[in-house]
Amino acid sequence: MPKFFCDYCDVYLTHDSISVRKAHNSGRNHLRNVVDYYQQIGHEKAQSVIDSITSSYAAEGQPMPSVHSTTPGAGGAGSVGAGGFPLLPPSAAAAAAAAGLQMPLSLPPPPFGFPARPGMMVPPPPPPFGFPPPPLGRGGAAAGFSGFPGMDAAGGGAGGGVQPQLLPGMVVPPGFVPPPGGMMVPPPGAGFTMPPPLGGFPAGAPLPGAPPGYGPPGAK
C-alpha cells in the first residue's frame, strides 16, 4: 500500500487515506512544523506559496477547507466563511497568521444604503447627534408622533395620528405639534419651560405651532 510523505514533518504516514491525512494535519506537531516553515521562508515567498495553494484548489474546482477543520471533531472540508466566501486551507491559514499576513476570514455587515443578503437583518441607521431613537408604535411609526402635517401615523391621508396625552380640562389648539414619545402636555403656568431654540431660530422668537403662553426662555 502506498504511503504519504509529509514535507513539513519529513515523515511517511502509515497509510495514504484521507482519514489518516486529516488526523496527521490536525496534530500539534504538524501545525507547529507548518508555522516554523513559513516563518523561515519570509513574507514574500510565503505569500506566493499561499497563492499557489489557493489557485490549485480553484483549478481543480474543489472548495477550500475551513480553518475550523483543523480542530478534532470539526466538520470536513468545504465549509465557507461569512458572506459565502471560501476560507484558506488549514496550512495556508496557519502560515498566514504566523507570517503576519492579513487574510479576510470574515466580512463586515453591509453599510447603509446597500442591500443585505436574503434573510439578514440590517440595523437601522443611527439617530442624529443628541437625539435618542424614537420608540416604535403600530405600523412602524414613532409613538406620539403624527408625522408630517396632513398625514396620519401610517403615512396615509389627513386626520389620524397618535394624539398627545392631555391633562383634564385642556384643549389642543389648531396647528399644535404634539411632543415626541407621547409626553403629557402641562397646563400654562405649571413651571414648564421650553428648551432653548435650535439653530436657525432667533432668541425670543415663538416656536411655530406652539399655543399661546408657550415660548422659549426669556420670551415675554
From Swiss-Prot:
This is U1 small nuclear ribonucleoprotein C. It comes from Tuber melanosporum (strain Mel28) (Perigord black truffle). Belongs to the U1 small nuclear ribonucleoprotein C family. SUPFAM superfamilies: beta-beta-alpha zinc fingers. Signal peptide: none annotated. Pfam families: zf-U1. Residues 197-220 are annotated as: Disordered. It is found in: Nucleus. GO terms for biological process: mRNA 5'-splice site recognition; spliceosomal snRNP assembly. Residues 208-220 have a biased composition (Pro residues). Component of the spliceosomal U1 snRNP, which is essential for recognition of the pre-mRNA 5' splice-site and the subsequent assembly of the spliceosome. U1-C is directly involved in initial 5' splice-site recognition for both constitutive and regulated alternative splicing. The interaction with the 5' splice-site seems to precede base-pairing between the pre-mRNA and the U1 snRNA. Stimulates commitment or early (E) complex formation by stabilizing the base pairing of the 5' end of the U1 snRNA and the 5' splice-site region. It comes from the Eukaryota.
